UniProtKB/Swiss-Prot annotation:
GO CC, alphabetical: cytosolic small ribosomal subunit
Lineage, opening ranks: Bacteria, Bacillati, Bacillota, Bacilli, Lactobacillales
GO molecular function: RNA binding; structural constituent of ribosome
Superkingdom of origin organism: Bacteria
Encoding gene per record: rpsI
Signal sequence interval, chain numbering: none
Protein name per the record: Small ribosomal subunit protein uS9
């Protein structure tokens, strides 16, 4: 018999995470590596677990993540968004606490583009009056 899986897709900055939740012990695997190997910073790893803490489902699901694009923070944010969406499939009653914690909202902030004539998005060379 096929194992029960819950899927969710999360996005943040340039990162896209495809998340699968499988009933288990709380293992997190990102791109075939353990989360400790994939994301070296504990504070960013803690961010991933927020949806489980809000819904009180910590250590009830194994998380399998395929993520690409962006850096550590973007990928962690995308994974968090994907986990929150997958938890909605588990139980639609989770919508209220997840929404209240702001975990279902896609963070729309993106990198501002570089403008011609400037060194970066907003950095200009020093202004000389005379």
């Amino acid at each position: 018999m096929a194992q029960v899986q819950y899927r969710g897709t999360g996005r943040r900055k340039d990162s896209v995470a495809r998340v699968r939740l499988v009933p288990g012990t709380g293992k997190i695997v990102m791109n075939d590596k353990s989360v400790e190997d994939y994301i070296p910073f504990a504070d960013i790893r803690k961010e991933l677990l927020q949806p489980f803490e809000v819904t009180e489902t910590t250590d009830q699901y194994d998380v399998l993540v395929n993520v690409n694009g962006g850096g550590f923070h973007g990928q962690a944010g995308a994974t968090r968004h994907g986990i929150a969406r997958a938890l909605l499939e588990v139980d639609p009653d989770f919508r209220t606490p997840l929404k209240r914690a702001g975990l279902l909202t896609r963070d729309a902030r993106m990198k501002e583009r570089k403008k011609p004539g400037l060194k970066k998005a907003r950095k200009a060379s020093q202004f000389s009056k005379r």
